[in-house]
Amino acid sequence: MSTKYKLRVTGECKQNMKLCKRRGLPMDELWTVVGKLLNGEQLEEKYQAHILSGDRKGQWECHIQPDWLLIWEIHNQELVLVLLNTGTHSDLFGKKYKKR
């Protein structure tokens, strides 16, 4: 099956994917989102996809579940989808993250 983008996954993301699997998170949900991104599809509103700012300017985040995130960026020149990280809010943003 041909996709719009090639997939690249960072080492940190691979490590955290294993952690998510050990936590019993439904990995098929993650791969459903990744499949949509690889095909250049817009994610449904339920995923709350949005661009990040600050240190993560140019990166995107979505909510696979309320406290399970995926962070990625797209390199259009290479047509590469780069999965940067996945995990809970505290996994990804540490102590500086505060729930509102």
Residue spans of the language-model regions?
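Enriched for short, Lys/Arg-rich terminal
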Residues: 1-6, 15, 22-27, 67-69, ...
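A short, surface-exposed loop/turn module that caps and links secondary-structure elements
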Residues: 36-63
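Generic alpha-helical hydrophobic packing signal
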Residues: 5-8, 61
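N-terminal first-folded block
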Residues: 8-44
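Flexible domain-boundary/linker segments
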Residues: 30, 47, 51-54, 69, ...
